[in-house]
């Protein structure tokens, strides 16, 4: 008996595509007269996630008008909650159950649905960020530092683009590191895989243990691991780049908010770690579960790429706070 996950394409409709581009986790359940099993699939492909983000950004530009920063925050929460609820409703109506048979050899019942809670959170985050980015004007930057999410997003965006450019430049000369990281099967789609790889390397640049392909990257793996010297040098260089950007950011925060009585570094570190965690959550690729009896040609076992959400949140917060504090303190020596 054989069953290929690719056969599910026959049951996909436009509602499933909408949920898929919002990076929801699909739960697949299959059963026969003799056994049953389930698989969870989360494909956190960032390029796909940009589709709803750009659509929400465009709608925010057209429809949302704000007069003050407080209205912007309320609108952002409202749009995020509404978009998340819409995805939940779509998910409820898109749950699918089907039967697959192969002459008289076997009967297979298949059902799949998206994770409702995750879809709501994804929708809320996408709706909130897109509305907030469009509505938050520079003239409010110094008025309410507790809403200073945009500065953290800009810092992470600079780091992401820098990491992507570094990876792209190295790949043009020699893409051997892709083979070393276990990504050789994707070397033909260099731009696509690098956009995904950059998010993993960015998490690692914040000292977060990260799984990439067949490798578990951490500070200890660079020191004692079996990676080639060139690959280790690349990873160390990106870590130093992260250090430099955060030190400069801390330095600029001191100059910008030198008269503020609030703990600017703490507030920024919280925003920074939350956004890094969101990026990590959206970029995780996971296939896992148990399908006994079924010989599924496209299912090779548990696969995980990315970093743990809780680990990312804690480590990136501690790391960013320490490095930002260094940059913040350096301005005192002027």
Predicted regions span which residues?
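Transmembrane alpha-helical segments in integral membrane proteins
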Residues: 38-68, 122-142, 230-258, 317-334
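Surface-exposed interaction/gating patches
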Residues: 150-151, 155-164, 223-242
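Alpha-helical transmembrane segments and their helix-start/interface "positive-inside/aromatic belt" motifs
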Residues: 1, 67-81, 145-163, 258-270
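Membrane-interface helix-loop-helix junctions at boundaries between adjacent transmembrane segments
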Residues: 71-74, 94-125, 130-158
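Small-residue-rich
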Residues: 50-60, 64-65, 72, 79-93
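Long, glycine/tryptophan/cysteine-rich extracytoplasmic
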Residues: 1-53, 93-116, 168-238, 278-321, ...
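Aromatic-anchored segments of alpha-helical transmembrane domains
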Residues: 80-90, 160, 164-165, 271-279
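C-terminal substrate/ligand-recognition segments
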Residues: 237-244, 262-275
